[in-house]
């Protein structure tokens, strides 16, 4: 039986990845910061909380990380832990950069020092590229990070490459573009729009307040993206790959689709310039051809289908704001 170690297991990607690996017969060890602060909703929702083992670990403590990896001796290590909100990174740039960089370096250094054949996956981000001159984004596209979050992810990306080339570690970067599901936190755009639109639908909110809708993003479906993560660590040698849908969709069209699905008039939409980001990228989408070819991975689902899936799940679990606070 293979053993997989997942940092960030309670998040959207970590939970879906844990479910996939449990179904494949892995022993899954999830790394959390603290049992007291962890939100176990996602693991409960997917029915796997009792099928994984949770271990506390401060990823910024190298000695702790080394000891845990020696104890667990994983075959595969997926690093999905990060402060992953672009917006929040502008409010907390120092803590975002410190945590996102130090955690990656400590995991890589621990693997080097433990000196066991551990395969390492690093969750990288399309935000690293910033404002690009040509689309689609490929691995040869120059990086120009425009946020503290993007800066931290770019550093982690190059750290993986450095350790791979310097110490012959099986370490891969999966450069993921936006990917959504019902388990996405409500602080992210798509889930925020669906959640608040649901409140309008049920008469618990008057308007949807959003920032700049005149931007386009490459959105995908989280359960399919975690499958690509797993496939990356099954290759004969490590690769850095772009995991994306290969096309962009405007934020405005997403809002309009959700409103139509829920029968909400567009007059309920309010543009709030206070919600604009300090620096915004107009359009971004990636080239997933290498991932499809190397991983034998297919992605052909329309993002509107994903929105419909999330709406159905959100509808079935909806609670009014008052009920949610209880």
Regions found by a protein language model. Name each.
Residues 145-152, 182, 186-190, 218-221:
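The catalytic Tyr-centered alpha-helix of NAD(P)H-dependent dehydrogenases
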Residues 12, 16, 147, 184-188, ...:
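Amphipathic alpha-helical recognition patches that constitute DNA-binding helices
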Residues 63, 130-132, 183, 253, ...:
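Activation segment
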Residues 1-179, 301, 310, 314:
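N-terminal Rossmann-like NAD(P)+-binding domain of SDR-like oxidoreductases, especially those catalyzing
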Residues 23, 30-31, 190-191, 197-326:
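C-terminal substrate-binding subdomain of Rossmann-fold SDR/epimerase-dehydratase oxidoreductases
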Residues 151, 155-163, 192-196, 254, ...:
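Hydrophobic alpha-helix immediately C-terminal to the catalytic Tyr-X-X-X-Lys motif of short-chain
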């Amino acid at each position: 039986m293979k053993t997989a170690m997942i940092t960030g297991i309670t998040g959207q990607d970590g939970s879906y990845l844990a479910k996939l690996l449990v179904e494949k017969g892995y022993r899954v060890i999830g790394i959390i910061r603290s049992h007291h602060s962890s939100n176990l909703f996602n693991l409960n929702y997917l029915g796997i909380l009792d099928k994984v083992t949770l271990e506390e670990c401060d990823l910024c403590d190298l000695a702790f990380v080394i000891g845990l990896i020696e104890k667990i001796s994983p075959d595969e290590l997926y690093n999905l832990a990060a402060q992953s909100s672009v917006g929040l990174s502008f409010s907390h740039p120092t803590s975002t950069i410190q945590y996102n960089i130090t955690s990656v370096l400590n995991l890589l250094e621990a693997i080097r020092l433990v000196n066991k054949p551990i395969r390492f996956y690093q969750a990288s981000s399309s935000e690293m590229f910033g404002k690009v001159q040509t689309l689609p984004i490929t691995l040869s596209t120059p990086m120009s990070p425009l946020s503290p979050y993007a800066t931290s992810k770019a550093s982690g990306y190059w750290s993986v490459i450095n350790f791979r080339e310097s110490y012959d570690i099986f370490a891969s970067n999966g450069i993921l573009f936006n990917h959504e599901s019902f388990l996405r936190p409500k602080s992210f755009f798509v889930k925020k729009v669906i959640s608040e639109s649901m409140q309008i639908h049920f008469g618990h909110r008057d308007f949807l307040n959003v920032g700049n809708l005149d931007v386009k993003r490459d959105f995908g479906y989280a359960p399919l993206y975690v499958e690509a993560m797993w496939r990356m660590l099954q290759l004969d040698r490590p690769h850095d790959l772009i995991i994306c849908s290969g096309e962009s969709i405007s934020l405005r069209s997403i809002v309009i689709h959700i409103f139509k699905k829920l029968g909400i008039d567009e007059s309920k939409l309010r543009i709030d310039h206070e919600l604009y980001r300090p620096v915004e990228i107009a359009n971004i989408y990636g080239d997933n051809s290498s991932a499809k070819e190397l991983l034998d991975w297919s992605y052909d689902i329309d993002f509107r289908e994903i929105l419909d899936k999330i709406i159905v799940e959100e509808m079935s679990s909806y609670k009014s704001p008052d009920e949610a606070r209880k």
